[in-house]
């Protein structure tokens, strides 16, 4: 049986650990409610933007790049709508900067690695756009079958529309230049405080289903022109898709960390109780 000094030292160590995990749980709990409210408030706008975009594309029809002069890749909407043979796929992989969030980051990274392997098997190259320190670190050591872009670290800490626009411009530039032919986001969908799902959705080329034929919609008129409206709407749609993904990821990460730290605190409490019993038994046998 361990001596009293060793047991007392272990109890003290576990108590210190419990203080840390409990504090981290409280911090995550304080942030996650705000993150939950933000992501849920943003969803109706994203859904309505998608709905509007669907109607516009069905109304406008074909797109021509002739005579279009733009300064930003995001403004080059005809090329952003172009579908071509996929030789290189980009993956925007959204993780957190910190660990101690259960299996949150590892689940996302495993999904991305599986996608890289699937691309390799079908002869498609992969370019990784990592968001968060965990993604940057993981893909630096994950192999050589993909190109790794510079990571977006600060954006993972505080999701904003400005940060989403920075990412959107970078991937739009690579798409328009032909460096990539497609890009998907690998992120999480926040369900509730106890649940999230790792998901993937298309960003470029902009892929919008046509409206159902039986739906009766008013005729759309565009001022000053369809081109000018789409030139504003396409960048908004792409940026908002990325922003929504960042919000979903942030809420999922905080909820996962709160759950993980709650479990760690409970485990620490159980260990303290067990060690306390051992300590008392040792006292009896002295």
What feature does the model see in each segment?
Residues 1-284:
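C-terminal beta-strand-loop-alpha-helix "lid" module of Rossmann-like NAD(P)-dependent dehydrogenases
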């Amino acid at each position: 049986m361990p001596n009293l000094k060793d047991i007392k030292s272990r109890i003290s160590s576990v108590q210190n650990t419990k203080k840390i995990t409990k504090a981290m749980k409280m911090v995550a709990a304080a942030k996650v409610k705000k993150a939950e409210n933000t992501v849920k408030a943003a969803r109706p706008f994203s859904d309505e933007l998608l709905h509007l975009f669907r109607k516009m594309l069905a109304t406008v029809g074909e797109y021509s790049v002739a005579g279009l002069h733009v300064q930003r890749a995001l403004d080059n909407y005809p090329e952003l709508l172009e579908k071509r043979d996929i030789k290189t796929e980009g993956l925007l992989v959204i993780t957190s900067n910190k660990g101690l969030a259960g299996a949150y980051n590892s689940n996302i990274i495993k999904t991305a690695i599986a996608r890289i392997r699937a691309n390799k098997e079908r002869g498609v190259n992969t370019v990784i756009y990592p968001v968060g320190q965990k993604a940057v670190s993981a893909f630096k050591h994950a192999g050589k079958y993909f190109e790794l872009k510079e990571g977006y670290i600060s954006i993972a800490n505080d999701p904003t529309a400005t940060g989403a626009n920075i990412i959107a411009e970078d991937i739009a530039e690579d798409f328009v230049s032909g460096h990539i032919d497609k890009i998907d986001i690998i992120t999480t969908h926040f369900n509730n405080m106890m649940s999230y799902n790792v998901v993937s959705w298309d960003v470029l080329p902009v892929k919008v289903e046509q409206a159902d034929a039986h739906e009766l919609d008013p005729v759309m008129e565009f001022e000053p022109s369809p081109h000018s409206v789409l030139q504003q709407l396409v960048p908004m749609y792409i940026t908002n898709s990325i922003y929504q993904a960042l919000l979903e990821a942030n809420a999922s990460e905080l909820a996962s960390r709160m759950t993980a730290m709650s479990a760690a605190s409970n485990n620490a409490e159980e260990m303290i109780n067990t060690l306390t019993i051992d300590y008392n038994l040792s006292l009896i046998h002295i």
